[in-house]
Amino acid sequence: MKLDIKILDPRMREQLPAYATTGSAGLDLRACLDAPLTLEPGQTVLVPTGLAIHLADPGYAALILPRSGMGHKHGIVLGNLVGLIDSDYQGQLMISTWNRGTTTFTLNPMERLAQLVIVPVVQATFNIVDEFDTSERGEGGFGSTGKH
């Protein structure tokens, strides 16, 4: 798939999103900062990427997801948990960055912060019914299928 990308900050020309390995699902996104950014515990900030994308095809969307090491090692996760980029969005990709940890964290310019995953989208239409056909699960939820 070819993805239209607009470089909003000239430094990003040399730091385009990239797959770390041939098996990677996500493209690494970097913090397009001019100086280190200190996040205090509990603080959330929007971090620019210096890039914009346009998927154009309503059959696709992009997800901004955390990098596992940032969350596990440093407590740095996404403030919105998952960023959803619709196919018709054309603005700068911003990363809602939340320090859920207990210590201060410093994010450096051009540090890999999140990942972008392109996913297929199915737009549903509704079929209004009075009752559903019976299923094995029914209305059971929130642990109703057991612990293990």
UniProtKB/Swiss-Prot annotation:
InterPro entries to which the protein is assigned, alphabetical: dUTPase, dUTPase-like, dUTPase-like_sf, dUTPase_trimeric
Signal peptide limits: none
A Gene Ontology biological process term: dUMP biosynthetic process
EC number(s) stated in the UniProt entry for this protein: 3.6.1.23
Listed pathway(s): Pyrimidine metabolism; dUMP biosynthesis; dUMP from dCTP (dUTP route): step 2/2
Superkingdom, natural source: Bacteria
Cofactor(s) listed in the protein's UniProt record: Mg(2+)
Known catalytic reactions: dUTP + H2O = dUMP + diphosphate + H(+)
Keyword Hydrolase: yes
GO MF annotations, alphabetized: dUTP diphosphatase activity; magnesium ion binding
Keyword Oxidoreductase attached: no
Chain positions recorded as substrate binding sites: 67-69, 80, 84-86, 94
Cited Gene3D superfamilies: 2.70.40.10
Functional description taken from the UniProt entry: This enzyme is involved in nucleotide metabolism: it produces dUMP, the immediate precursor of thymidine nucleotides and it decreases the intracellular concentration of dUTP so that uracil cannot be incorporated into DNA.
PANTHER family: DEOXYURIDINE 5'-TRIPHOSPHATE NUCLEOTIDOHYDROLASE
Name listed for the protein in its UniProt record: Deoxyuridine 5'-triphosphate nucleotidohydrolase
